[in-house]
Amino acid sequence: MADYLISGGTSYVPDDGLTAQQLFNCGDGLTYNDFLILPGYIDFTADQVDLTSALTKKITLKTPLVSSPMDTVTEAGMAIAMALTGGIGFIHHNCTPEFQANEVRKVKKYEQGFITDPVVLSPKDRVRDVFEAKARHGFCGIPITDTGRMGSRLVGIISSRDIDFLKEEEHDCFLEEIMTKREDLVVAPAGITLKEANEILQRSKKGKLPIVNEDDELVAIIARTDLKKNRDYPLASKDAKKQLLCGAAIGTHEDDKYRLDLLAQAGVDVVVLDSSQGNSIFQINMIKYIKDKYPNLQVIGGNVVTAAQAKNLIDAGVDALRVGMGSGSICITQEVLACGRPQATAVYKVSEYARRFGVPVIADGGIQNVGHIAKALALGASTVMMGSLLAATTEAPGEYFFSDGIRLKKYRGMGSLDAMDKHLSSQNRYFSEADKIKVAQGVSGAVQDKGSIHKFVPYLIAGIQHSCQDIGAKSLTQVRAMMYSGELKFEKRTSSAQVEGGVHSLHSYEKRLF
């Protein structure tokens, strides 16, 4: 009975757990599996949790998810899918500058508000020109002007309905013979708002709505497919022109200035300086060059894992920092070069420093599951960059293959000999371009099929929301505020605790995540 007679009353609650400062000031390097977050009080549903996060000083995303600039992870297909689901993708640079810029262009053209530079043909162009345009751009709703250029008089439009049933011998017909004539078109006047134009397009039941000035000259066009995308993807990441956001990676060498120019012309929103060790004079000079030439272009520096590294890049003018060195599943930098830092410690230390300057942090590497994402965000990261977690999705580059009956896709580190042999950009990332003997800092492997991003990312989003609910925070901003104030508590896990926290004591089981 005496055990129940301890004084203090019902208001007494013993201090429990560790603050983030206490957890990470012990001198040990910790990674995501080494600790847990202690739960809080729930008075809201998971779907009320706001995941809005800062990617950079000027770019905000509705979900804190970013795809890595790796040649087996992010090209246009992945970047489009990530932007539609509220994140952003970074096109890799292990390719020619022209290829990379074209991938960015595909993302920026995928969804638009007012399209001010559409494909335009003239009445004297032929049907085969429409099929060529369709093969190149993926659509065939093409306005026809008297000169075949924007800014000249609109005379008609060609749609799939005009050409679907034409025979091969009719492909030499002039477009003026088969196009929908101007008098049969629904158009809107220049100066109309996008909302008003969309309403006209909905009522018209047409595929395209040309926008013309008082002289009947074509100045823009809007598409019904974009209306449907707006409806189907309410979280989509877009710029001021209603185009999808897109990032791209570049290096820090003189040749990368040409690549930068092509990317800027393609409309890239943000560039990440892709280096395994970002605290270099080469990166500092490149940051200053970009900020001088393209002051409105957002620049992400990295990779860094210490406050001292971060300071130099912040002083140079970066808009965000990428944190991680040697923690990726395909990275062997820590093993080979003895440099790096366990990822949880790196994220906390850099985030705690960078927040004083309003610089967001991207946690890059070591993410194996949705719990790791939640932990990275709780340690101060604004967004999380993923490579292996998104590899082998439908939208990732590469073809599927089968091994022992399992459907796989290739996945490799940019420091692997495979990637270095493909293009010089991978060597530049690891300062290896002049080496006679290449020192691999990554490996090549394969990852099991995960299905489409459009199913996988919503699962990740729901998982993060449920994690925030268990913590007792209605937003990621609140999670970070609780962490820095000491309200959010953590606890170290022993190896036995980690075993207990996983699946155990079963003869067999099936682990289905979504």
UniProtKB/Swiss-Prot annotation:
Q: What is a single molecular function from GO for this protein?
A: RNA binding
Q: Cite the EC number.
A: 1.1.1.205
GO BP terms, alphabetized: 'de novo' XMP biosynthetic process; cellular response to interleukin-4; circadian rhythm; GMP biosynthetic process; GTP biosynthetic process; lymphocyte proliferation
- List residues of cross-link (Glycyl lysine isopeptide (Lys-Gly) (interchain with G-Cter in SUMO2)): K195, K208, K438
Residues the record lists as N6-acetyllysine modifications: K511
The answer to whether the entry has keyword Repeat is yes
Note the effect listed for L263F. Answer: Results in 10-fold decrease of enzymatic activity
UniProt's post-translational modification comment states: Ubiquitinated leading to its degradation by the proteasome. The N-terminus is blocked.
Name the source's superkingdom. Eukaryota
The record ties this protein, via Gene3D superfamilies, to: Aldolase class I
- Biochemical pathway: Purine metabolism; XMP biosynthesis via de novo pathway; XMP from IMP: step 1/1
Which PROSITE patterns would you find in this protein's record?
CBS, IMP_DH_GMP_RED
- What does the record say about activity regulation? Mycophenolic acid (MPA) is a non-competitive inhibitor that prevents formation of the closed enzyme conformation by binding to the same site as the amobile flap. In contrast, mizoribine monophosphate (MZP) is a competitive inhibitor that induces the closed conformation. MPA is a potent inhibitor of mammalian IMPDHs but a poor inhibitor of the bacterial enzymes. MZP is a more potent inhibitor of bacterial IMPDH. Subject to product inhibition by XMP and NADH. Also inhibited by ADP.
Which residues does the annotation say bind K(+)? G326, G328, C331, E500, G501, G502
> Which of the residues bear the PTM Phosphotyrosine?
Y400
- Domain (CBS) ranges: 114-173, 179-237
Q: What class of enzyme is it?
A: oxidoreductase
Its keywords, alphabetically, are: Acetylation, CBS domain, Cytoplasm, DNA-binding, GMP biosynthesis, Isopeptide bond, Metal-binding, NAD, Nucleus, Oxidoreductase, Phosphoprotein, Potassium, Purine biosynthesis, Repeat, RNA-binding, Ubl conjugation
Q: State the GO CC annotations.
A: cytoplasm; cytosol; extracellular exosome; extracellular region; ficolin-1-rich granule lumen; membrane; nucleus; peroxisomal membrane
Modification sites for Phosphoserine: S122, S160, S416
HAMAP family membership? IMPDH (MF_01964)
Q: Could you say which protein family the record assigns here? A: Belongs to the IMPDH/GMPR family.
Additional information: Because IMPDH activity is tightly linked with cell proliferation, it has been recognized as a target for cancer and viral chemotherapy and as a target for immunosuppressive drugs. The activities of the antitumor drug tiazofurin, the antiviral drug ribavirin, and the immunosuppressive drugs mizoribine and mycophenolic acid (MPA) are attributed to the inhibition of IMPDH. In addition, bacterial and parasitic IMPDH's differ significantly from mammalian enzymes, which makes it a suitable target for anti-infective drugs.
This one is known as: Inosine-5'-monophosphate dehydrogenase 2
